Amino acid sequence: MKLQFTKMHGAGNDFVVLDGIHQQIDLTPAQWRALASRHFGVGADQILIVEKPSRPDVDFRYRIVNADGSEVEHCGNGARCFVRFVTDKGMTDKRSVRVEVMNGVITLTLQDDGQVTVDMGAPELEPARVPFRAEGLPTRAEGADTLYGLEVNGRTEWISVVSMGNPHAVQVVDDVENFPVLQDGPVVEHHAAFPNRVNAGFMQVQDRHAIRLRVYERGAGETLACGTGACAAVVAGIRRGLLDSPVRVHTHGGDLTIAWDGGAEPVRMTGPATTVFEGSIDLAALPA
């Protein structure tokens, strides 16, 4: 059986996008991993699946599978590619679509200049709902935020915790390019305080409207960009009194613009979505 796919990226965060409405998709965890493999499959940070909605008030359902075969709640860069995909494929003629994700509904809008704005919803800041186990950890206040001290490779690192539909730990660093992201990222991801693991973000504040960001993503490793990570970093920076909305987030894969008015207001992310190529892969070539 041939599986049709489209390869896309959002600021260098790359995806295999599958139309699950017009073809049957039933892959094993090993097949998901092989499809995402850059040596044995197509190669991607994550795999996005377009499906029919399960409720009448949305246009599509959106599923995300990590490169390690685990399914996750949300992906902001993937959401931008999602709306570009369904628009280019003629699956909708709407400029703005409502999409069902694992834990809610998001609104995606295709702008006239080709950029995509995603209404990411309000951030979740209650530690237990991230989820994050704060008991027994040292804390300190900074602005409106509470920072938590984690032991990471023999050092105490102070983090903010934010959920953008998926869990994030955000650390402010002086020089993000030379920070040991590949060494610290896995330690933070698997820290016992995060029962569902966590995406580890490392941001350098350039001015009140600009940051540089690297993210070690849960189940994927460091990626060129992370949309939900950019949102979480900006929320943390605003709450700590370091940033003002809107904020330009510079990643290795490109720039994103994040806006948040605080409190229960939604976070809005704007950035590119690019189609690279289309193809098909023989499922028999993937391990079962």
From Swiss-Prot:
Pathway info: Amino-acid biosynthesis; L-lysine biosynthesis via DAP pathway; DL-2,6-diaminopimelate from LL-2,6-diaminopimelate: step 1/1
UniProt binding sites for substrate: 13, 46, 66, 76-77, 166, 199, 217-218, 227-228
Active-site residues, as the UniProt record annotates them: 75, 226
EC number: 5.1.1.7
GO biological process: lysine biosynthetic process via diaminopimelate
Places the protein is found: Cytoplasm
Function comment: Catalyzes the stereoinversion of LL-2,6-diaminopimelate (L,L-DAP) to meso-diaminopimelate (meso-DAP), a precursor of L-lysine and an essential component of the bacterial peptidoglycan.
Protein name stated in the entry: Diaminopimelate epimerase
Lineage: Bacteria, Pseudomonadati, Pseudomonadota, Betaproteobacteria, Burkholderiales
